[in-house]
């Protein structure tokens, strides 16, 4: 999201989302919130993230309240970004990924460049990328010939259909 310097709307409010409930990520969330606050951004924690990390000094908000914010910041790895994209797509709020995972192919900001990247984004120097999502539906034949829907989900870049235990990277 920070690659090219296209003047966009400056960021005044942001919510931090993470599904990685580990102590180093908790410190990163506090650090990101502190840096954003110093840059004049009102920072919130997504309600589930707030419960998972127990950071009472940052106000928590619900998913519905996120709709009115300027930015969603996902702290974690590629899996966190993919999960957030899938569950928050209907909010129509830009998502910025900050890498705290292993690969970081889908995250926009590396922790080593955090200060400079946040300054640029807050000032409005970022570009937006629309990503295609796949609506995946699985159905099975039924006696009346009409397929019975047994599963449905959105996917950002791929979907896997398997019958058994799935291997993870």
Model-predicted segments: where are they?
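Short, charged/polar low-complexity linear motifs in solvent-exposed/disordered segments
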Residues: 42, 100, 122-124
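Short, acidic/small-residue loops that bind anionic groups at enzyme active sites
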Residues: 91-109
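A generic structural signal for short, solvent-exposed coil/turn residues
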Residues: 6-8, 35-37, 87, 97, ...
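N-terminal glycine-/serine-/threonine-rich phosphate-binding loop
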Residues: 2-75, 79-89
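Catalytic core of DAGKc-family lipid kinases
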Residues: 105-169
């Amino acid at each position: 999201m920070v690659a090219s310097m296209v003047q966009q709307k400056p960021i005044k409010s942001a919510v931090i989302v993470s599904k990685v409930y580990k102590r180093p990520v908790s410190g990163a969330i506090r650090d990101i919130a502190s840096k954003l606050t110093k840059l004049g951004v009102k920072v919130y924690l997504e309600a589930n993230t707030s419960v998972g990390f127990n950071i009472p000094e940052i106000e928590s908000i619900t998913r519905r309240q996120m709709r009115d914010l300027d930015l969603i910041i996902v702290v974690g790895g590629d899996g966190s970004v993919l999960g957030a994209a899938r569950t928050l797509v209907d909010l129509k709020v830009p998502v910025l990924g900050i890498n705290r995972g292993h690969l970081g192919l889908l995250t926009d900001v590396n922790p080593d460049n955090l200060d400079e990247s946040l300054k640029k984004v807050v000032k409005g120097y970022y570009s937006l990328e629309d990503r295609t999502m796949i609506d995946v539906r699985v159905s099975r034949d039924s006696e009346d010939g009409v397929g019975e829907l047994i599963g449905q989900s959105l996917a950002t870049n791929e979907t896997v259909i398997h019958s058994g235990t799935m291997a993870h990277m």
